[in-house]
């Protein structure tokens, strides 16, 4: 039988929903040589703000 491991609830992701605007932009991010630039055109569904759809 393998040894048991202990899982702590405080490690990892916390439950709940964060405001998307708080998580999608990092103003002090510095690009790296390994970063990949990708562009997508997104059309929001009716009632969804454009910044939330992208």
UniProtKB/Swiss-Prot annotation:
Catalytic activity reported: 2 (2R)-3-phosphoglycerate + 2 H(+) = D-ribulose 1,5-bisphosphate + CO2 + H2O; D-ribulose 1,5-bisphosphate + O2 = 2-phosphoglycolate + (2R)-3-phosphoglycerate + 2 H(+)
Lineage: Eukaryota, Viridiplantae, Streptophyta, Embryophyta, Tracheophyta
Assembly description: Heterohexadecamer of 8 large chains and 8 small chains.
Protein name in UniProt: Ribulose bisphosphate carboxylase large chain
Location within or outside the cell: Plastid, Chloroplast
GO terms, molecular function: monooxygenase activity; ribulose-bisphosphate carboxylase activity
Organism from which the protein derives: Icacina mannii
Top-rank taxon: Eukaryota
Gene this chain is encoded by: rbcL
Family: Belongs to the RuBisCO large chain family. Type I subfamily.
